[in-house]
């Protein structure tokens, strides 16, 4: 089943979408149903900034899969490349809030997205895009999904399509040594790398901002956007690097903020911004997304971001 097929998307994202249950407050037994999955969050964030986006994945032939497809339809995300797998379920995860921040628990083994394989890839759609976005989770959820992600990257590069990669390291999904090896293989074929501070220090063993971006740039990317949370982002190209300050808000939940940054950043690059302009915009979008609960509901519109930037 395929639905919602506007003009060819400029931005495609490949990965797993999930149903989210987010604790309503610290210590509370109530969980609010929402939506997640890093690359899906990314797609929605980019779409809310006005970009033409599409998602490449699989969902189960179940109620949760239908909810996700309905979500993408509402968000103007192209679902032409979303498969419905009648033999698998849609993944679910829980977000709990405590004194040390938020914690995640996943029910995703054998999910429809984890069964995705190279033969499922929409090669023509990938070749027609301007950017394809993947993450460490795209690579980690299963061996077949990893093979599909790496093949998608190779096909994109062979057709002049830029590759965007967010590290999103999840050690519950795979051991650190394998994560390092596979992610470095992906980064070598990446044009735009979007690591978080915690991920990249764990992956590289480095702790200096400049040595981290030197390491990443030496492996292939032309743009590194190192996410620094409330402090903004450190943007580096082979010719220039600088901190782009964050936007200060009263944050209540940072779930998905990095995905929001990535979607907004890539949307602005596709529209013609340079990396530093794109980061200024994306920092505001990510900050605004922390003012509500969940990975999707608080993602701001383009109008909301532009209002802050204009002020």
Model features per residue range: what roles?
Residues 1-78, 250-252:
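Glycine-rich phosphate/adenosyl-contacting loop at the front of the ribokinase-like
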Residues 1-12, 154-158, 205, 209-311:
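Conserved phosphate-binding/catalytic region of the ribokinase-like
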Residues 10, 52, 162, 192, ...:
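Proline-centered loop/turn at the N-terminus of a beta-strand
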Residues 46, 196, 258:
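Short, conserved phosphate/pyrophosphate- and ester-handling motifs at nucleotide-, phospho-/glycolipid
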Residues 52-136, 307-311:
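Conserved N-terminal subdomain of the carbohydrate kinase-like
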Residues 131, 137-214, 231-233:
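Conserved beta-alpha-beta core of the PfkB/ribokinase-like small-molecule kinase fold
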